């Protein structure tokens, strides 16, 4: 129970005394030896101060520090550790993994330059075993992996005594005699560096928090154990005291009997070693150093040094809340935070922070106010309640009592100043937006989001729409009334949509487009409605507004059908036949939809292809009548018609041919003839009626697409023959014939062409054609030769493989005799037995046994 004021914290070295106006300087380590105080900084300086203690009538003390000098060590690294060896008049300084010896008075390095290299941290043996009063025993954790080293440090030299390996990487060390208490990566151990024997203490995870190892007396150490426990251990590996329960985040510990003092990132806690109870808590933020020097406990932040002064016992036994005067207690806590017990202080201090936050808020110091509100975990409804009408009417919130501030509402706070009021509203918008997705908002997200919506709507803020299209907890009734009041009808539609009232949302947007209500939020609201209904799952709602959309714009409105996801298009309500039926009175939309079916979805249905082709044709004819065929749009429609007629094989050719006949559409007529296989008629139209030789060549290409080379050659020969039949008098056809041959040499049979050509044509005229034909012929011949060679090679490989499978060759000569009749062989015909014997075929047939084993049944 924290009921004793055991220590007071007094300043020893103020920030200005140490660093002046140099904010970048920070304290890294301290050392105190008698009246001498040494401070090491991050910029490689050592500062020497003399402390003068003055006793106070209350039993406490104050300290005055007088700066003596400071010295730069010549490195660019921070001073990591300091340790005074008063017997040697030396200061051991760890910097840049090197321990340097400097004079305690003038801070000059020893002339010999003696130093210990390769140290990450060190500890002085306060129970030396060497026996020499003019040396100090030092243990270092080496930069070498899993290694500790023992040194003897003299006035001007150092000497290594021992190097010991450890089972894991050591992180911290304390020394007592021959015993090292080591914090390894996963456990604490006691190691006798003389014998090499070790004793495991208990496991510890150094990755979660840094270890603490402190020598607190002869052969006894204080360690930071798991679960926020301060553990005591002797060199024998046992504990003679019960552990103390301190913070989970302890970063430093010291002993000032009978107290264990612990430092975390917010507090200094004092625990009794006698009953293990926590006796005192002193608020101390940003502290990172806690050490005891001959009974004097020093703590430090990065900017200042403080001393924990133990109070007389009679001063320690006080009950801070005995008088129950809450207001006076709060004032005392604010003025002397370090004197208040931890548990009660947290509650009181949180309230103080909240009050301070409202004070800063009233002064329009919004950044400071926000930090105070967040750190004090303010119920944000306390802040929202200052703004009239922002809390929902259904909210049951009541302000804290006693009140955190003296203001009834924002009008009183700003005294009606509209500019200040606007600033306050902007701050609340920012603050609510920051906390709405954090734990602070848990339990009253509806209040926060509804208030935020009201602020956005009132300020015409762009984030209003972002709020409504993402997950939110805006209350529908309050929010809808507020949006309607501020004429935010588009946003109101989004609110309806979020609350699954799509019909109300769309009707509201339709009214905006129709001009029944005014809201200029979106200039493209019509397109937005189209897009919304395109992906709307409510089929009835889509059909309800389909006519309105198509009446506004057939080309855009039809997108509710054409851009709808494919799985929905296959539903009964949106099947193509129903949609086509509904689009009959909207011709442009009908064309767009049929294009979607035929071109985009590639539906293979004759009805759709024919319908689209007829609509194209009717539009072309209508435009030709009205514009004389000169309008660009008519040309585009005609191009679509021709492309459909060429690419599709599903439309009713005869029906379209009847409609095209006599309509003055020769190209379309030619395409339709081609679809019926009437290629000569088609080419005749292109050549003689239209005189479009390029179109005739294209016809041969697209009409034979997918039909094979023979079909294409036949079409080109037909076209060439048509050119040549006109005779030499038709100069343009002669030129066309020459161009056809020279540009499409590969498509012709050269032999047939040469028989057709007039004798009067020169070789030079047909040079490109002949060269191309020769090139193709040579290429074909060489390709054939290569193929033949490859085939022969492949056959040879197969023959070789076959011979290998048959086995070794059998040699038959004139001296070889039949093993049955002993006569020579007259011809290369024989029977071979498995034993290798060769006989005539007639001998093998007349005998039942071989001359030697095996039997005839085994011959080959």
Swiss-Prot record:
Record-level Gene Ontology MF annotations: SMAD binding; transforming growth factor beta receptor binding
CHCR repeats: 564-732
Keywords of the record: Cytoplasm, Endosome, Protein transport, Transport
Coiled-coil positions: none
Subcellular compartments: Cytoplasm; Early endosome
Consequences of knocking out this gene: Embryonic lethal, both before blastula stage or during gastrulation.
Chief place where the protein resides: cytoplasm
Domain CNH: 24-297
GO CC field: CORVET complex; early endosome; membrane
GO biological process annotation, one example: endosomal vesicle fusion
PROSITE patterns named in the record: CHCR (PS50236), CNH (PS50219)
Matches recorded under InterPro entries: Clathrin_H-chain/VPS_repeat, CNH_dom, Vam6/VPS39/TRAP1, VPS39/TGF_beta_rcpt-assoc_1, VPS39/TGFA1_Znf
Subunit structure and binding partners: Interacts with TGFBR2 and ACVR2B; in the absence of ligand stimulation. Interacts with TGFBR1, ACVRL1, BMPR1A and ACVR1B; in the absence of ligand stimulation and to a less extent. Interacts with SMAD4; the interaction seems to be mutually exclusive with the interaction of SMAD4 and phosphorylated SMAD2. May interact with ALOX5. Interacts with RAB5C. Interacts with VPS8, VPS11 and VPS16. Component of the putative class C core vacuole/endosome tethering (CORVET) complex; the core of which composed of the class C Vps proteins VPS11, VPS16, VPS18 and VPS33A, is associated with VPS8 and TGFBRAP1.
Described purpose of this protein according to its UniProt entry: Plays a role in the TGF-beta/activin signaling pathway. It associates with inactive heteromeric TGF-beta and activin receptor complexes, mainly through the type II receptor, and is released upon activation of signaling. May recruit SMAD4 to the vicinity of the receptor complex and facilitate its interaction with receptor-regulated Smads, such as SMAD2. Plays a role in vesicle-mediated protein trafficking of the endocytic membrane transport pathway. Believed to act as a component of the putative CORVET endosomal tethering complexes which is proposed to be involved in the Rab5-to-Rab7 endosome conversion probably implicating MON1A/B, and via binding SNAREs and SNARE complexes to mediate tethering and docking events during SNARE-mediated membrane fusion. The CORVET complex is proposed to function as a Rab5 effector to mediate early endosome fusion probably in specific endosome subpopulations.
Family statement drawn from the similarity comment of this UniProt entry: Belongs to the TRAP1 family.
Protein's recorded name: Transforming growth factor-beta receptor-associated protein 1
Organism encoding this protein: Mus musculus (Mouse)
The gene coding this protein: Tgfbrap1
